Amino acid sequence: MSHRKFSAPRHGSLGFLPRKRSSRHRGKVKSFPKDDASKPVHLTAFLGYKAGMTHIVREVDRPGSKVNKKEVVEAVTIVETPPMVVVGIVGYVETPRGLRTFKTVFAEHISDECKRRFYKNWHKSKKKAFTKYCKKWQDDTGKKQLEKDFNSMKKYCQVIRIIAHTQMRLLPLRQKKAHLMEIQVNGGTVAEKLDWARERLEQQVPVNQVFGQDEMIDVIGVTKGKGYKGVTSRWHTKKLPRKTHRGLRKVACIGAWHPARVAFSVARAGQKGYHHRTEINKKIYKIGQGYLIKDGKLIKNNASTDYDLSDKSINPLGGFVHYGEVTNDFIMLKGCVVGTKKRVLTLRKSLLVQTKRRALEKIDLKFIDTTSKFGHGRFQTMEEKKAFMGPLKKDRIAKEEGA
């Protein structure tokens, strides 16, 4: 029989071809939200680092629904977002060929973790990046030139973006090289945008100045890499019958004799994962504050709610697996996001006008789970664990050694 008995849709989408390793590790923003001059000046994106997942309990606020006023348990992802540092301003002009850079101005002082991004091997380099450039800010001729640049940007540019980098020293990661990106400034006139950006040169921008509670955002990143995979795993094609000669996790017919080539649309083995992806409509459940010192005391209770008053941080017992402790500001997103732990993620304001009731729903968290994510966690805090377990042998030994 030369034809199949039943028709079936093809396996796997051709919309994501070529399925190869991403050329960039950090998610690229290919389009920023549309500018609206009537709104106040604001940033449209931010960088964060995926820490891990937990679950929450909340009450649904959806009048008319069967689940209204009922408690639901939902999975959430914690993305650590330490403040970003603004180190430059870029002006763009609109041309018939699209946007073109007009002027770029960098700050006088740039940290080493940012400079590392401009070198392949920081250890062997002379570390001279920006040493000549920063002198512009110190002599009169340089200052005049910078002022001239800012004025010409106000006159000719239509789009203003800032150059900002992350602060790796605040994170529990080994990497020292900061991630650097351009973030579009929206709202107000071009002059207002430029003044706003100028005021914030060398300043830190926290995440709560970019996003708000209950906002819908987009997450751009590179997925978890899986390596070289067979056709069944990569394209989810059907396994052949058990008695098939020469393997069954294959495609039986890869095309006609002529044309004597294999079409691009035929499922083949190859790279799976580590692809650049944009996921839209991730709801922010909480924008949490990092650890802070108040009246000489370290305040950690950023996972307490109105219903759960226990003094606990967002970190599960033992920290997030394969990440560590989240000590900075963080964002809690509904559901999962792309990438492995420690992966840098680009968080962008939504391109769409959100009108759905689910998108506009107010989120009121009742409980955030902080049990250990390594094994079957039972305790929310160390105090709860100590109260249940009682005095342990290791505590007694430590006491004796101390005495």
Curated annotation (Swiss-Prot):
- Tell me where in or outside the cell this protein is found: Nucleus, Nucleolus; Cytoplasm
Offer one Pfam family short name for this entry: Ribosomal_L3
Q: Which residues carry this modification: N6-acetyllysine?
A: K136, K286, K294, K366, K373
| Chain positions with Tele-methylhistidine modification | H245
**Which terms does the UniProt entry file under GO BP?**
cellular response to interleukin-4; cytoplasmic translation
Query: PTMs?
Result: Constitutively monomethylated at His-245 by METTL18. Methylation at His-245 regulates translation elongation by slowing ribosome traversal on tyrosine codons: slower elongation provides enough time for proper folding of synthesized proteins and prevents cellular aggregation of tyrosine-rich proteins. It is not required for incorporation of RPL3 into ribosomes.
Q: Which GO terms describe its cellular component?
A: cytoplasm; cytosol; cytosolic large ribosomal subunit; nucleolus
- UniProt lists compositionally biased (Basic residues) regions at 18-31
Which positions are linked by Glycyl lysine isopeptide (Lys-Gly) (interchain with G-Cter in SUMO1)?
Answer: K294
Glycyl lysine isopeptide (Lys-Gly) (interchain with G-Cter in SUMO2), cross-linked positions: K39, K224, K226, K286, K366, K386, K393, K399
Q: Name one GO molecular function term.
A: structural constituent of ribosome
InterPro entries recorded = L3_arc_euk (IPR045077), Ribosomal_L3_dom_3_arc_sf (IPR044892), Ribosomal_uL3 (IPR000597), Ribosomal_uL3_CS (IPR019926), Transl_B-barrel_sf (IPR009000)
Keyword tags: Acetylation, Cytoplasm, Isopeptide bond, Methylation, Nucleus, Phosphoprotein, Ribonucleoprotein, Ribosomal protein, Ubl conjugation
Q: Where is this region: Disordered?
A: 1-36
Q: Which residues carry this modification: Phosphoserine?
A: S13, S304
Similarity comment text for this entry: Belongs to the universal ribosomal protein uL3 family.
Q: How does it assemble?
A: Component of the large ribosomal subunit. Interacts with DHX33.
Function of the protein: Component of the large ribosomal subunit. The ribosome is a large ribonucleoprotein complex responsible for the synthesis of proteins in the cell.
Protein name per its UniProtKB record: Large ribosomal subunit protein uL3
Name of the gene this protein is made from: Rpl3
